[in-house]
A protein has these predicted regions:
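N-terminal amphipathic/basic-hydrophobic helices that include classical n-h-c signal peptides
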Residues: 1-11
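Catalytic cores of DNA base-excision repair glycosylases
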Residues: 13-16, 22-192
Length: 192
């Protein structure tokens, strides 16, 4: 969240210039330029998501993003680091005892439900998708515990598609910059 706040602050420095742009595409281009000047690449940041390897493999990315819903990054890191020390595949995660998994991921919100969701998701990937993470938005959304934001993140970071994951922080920035006028993240993602 702190990283999103810093990004928003950088963009907000140039807010008047951005808001004076006549259309949304120009505003998005100006925002991109502003962010590019301040953050040349995401990998160069001190972001704990990157420095702890939470997205270093497609498996890790999917599991950590599923655990991140309704949870701040430090708690996700606290759960994922020990989890990824024990498991490195969907087979290993599925074989892990439910109580052991529940204990490991206890730092994240809704850990009981997420334990169940992860187990079902592993079964779906192994049995319905031949052990491979689905590479379409539609199929990702069929996985237990995967919603729009998680699917968008996977499509962007793992499959290289031009999608944007809109959470409450991104939605707030988009509304402040008058890129969208929406109250629901999914509607904003559809619009942009």
């Amino acid at each position: 969240m702190r990283h999103i706040s810093r990004l928003t602050a950088v963009v907000m420095q140039d807010q008047k210039h951005i808001q004076n742009s006549s259309n949304r595409v120009q505003r998005l281009d100006l925002i991109y330029e502003q962010l590019s000047r301040n953050y040349s690449t995401f990998d160069q940041t001190d972001d704990p998501w990157m420095t702890n390897g939470l997205s270093s493999t497609p498996f890790r990315c999917l599991v950590s993003v599923c655990l991140s819903t309704m949870t701040v990054t430090p708690r996700v890191v606290k759960a994922c680091v020990p989890l990824f020390e024990r498991v490195s595949s969907f087979e290993e995660l599925l074989a892990l005892d439910d109580e052991a998994l529940r204990t490991i991921i206890k730092p994240v919100a809704h850990y009981n439900r997420k334990t169940t969701n992860l187990k079902i998701m592993c079964q779906q990937i192994l049995w319905d998708f031949g052990g491979r993470i689905p590479d379409t938005h539609e199929d990702l959304m069929k996985l237990q515990g995967v919603g729009r934001k998680v699917a968008d993140i996977m499509m962007n970071f793992i499959f290289g598609q031009d999608t944007i994951a809109v959470d409450t922080h991104v939605l707030r920035a988009l509304n402040r910059l008058e890129i969208v006028h929406k109250s629901v993240a999914e509607a904003a993602a559809d619009e942009i």
